[in-house]
């Protein structure tokens, strides 16, 4: 994780593109995840609406992994089952942890599994989130 944190954004993107070159898109990471709730209706396999293609491209693989990481943001406990299940050894937990850390920073330090009463940040909706200042975006 420290190595990824020390990289520039273009370096991180190159790293993940290289990892996605090796991805088989077998969904072992998704299937092994105890927090994933979309096994029965996953965007990667949905035909209505048609969110993703079955194209074997780095773009589509990175798209799936990013969507999956965002779906888990705020819920991933860091157990590492996704990474252990990967037949080609992609360090996918690092992507989930990076996105989880960004969510934690945006949503007042939320950590998955610490408070059973807390609602994961991306499962709720506020018209204006406290730490996201959309009106200032240009």
PLM regions and their residue ranges:
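Ferredoxin-type iron-sulfur electron-transfer modules in oxidoreductases and energy-metabolism complexes
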Residues: 1-21, 37-138
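Hydrophobic alpha-helical transmembrane segments of multi-pass inner-membrane transport and secretion
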Residues: 23-26
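Structured, non-catalytic alpha/beta "coupling" segments that mediate domain-domain communication
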Residues: 28-31, 35
């Amino acid at each position: 994780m420290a190595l990824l944190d020390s990289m520039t954004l273009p370096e991180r993107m190159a790293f993940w593109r290289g990892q996605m070159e090796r991805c088989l898109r077998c969904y072992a990471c998704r299937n092994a995840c105890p927090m994933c709730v979309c096994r029965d209706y996953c965007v990667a396999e949905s035909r209505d609406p048609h969110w993703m293609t079955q194209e074997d491209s780095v773009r589509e693989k990175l798209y799936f992994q990013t969507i999956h990481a965002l779906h888990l943001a705020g819920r991933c406990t860091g157990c590492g089952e996704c990474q252990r299940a990967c037949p080609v050894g992609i360090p996918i937990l690092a992507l989930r942890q990076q996105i989880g850390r960004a969510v934690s920073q945006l949503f007042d330090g939320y950590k998955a599994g610490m408070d059973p009463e807390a609602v994961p940040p991306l499962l709720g909706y506020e018209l204006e989130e406290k730490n996201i200042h959309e009106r200032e975006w240009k």
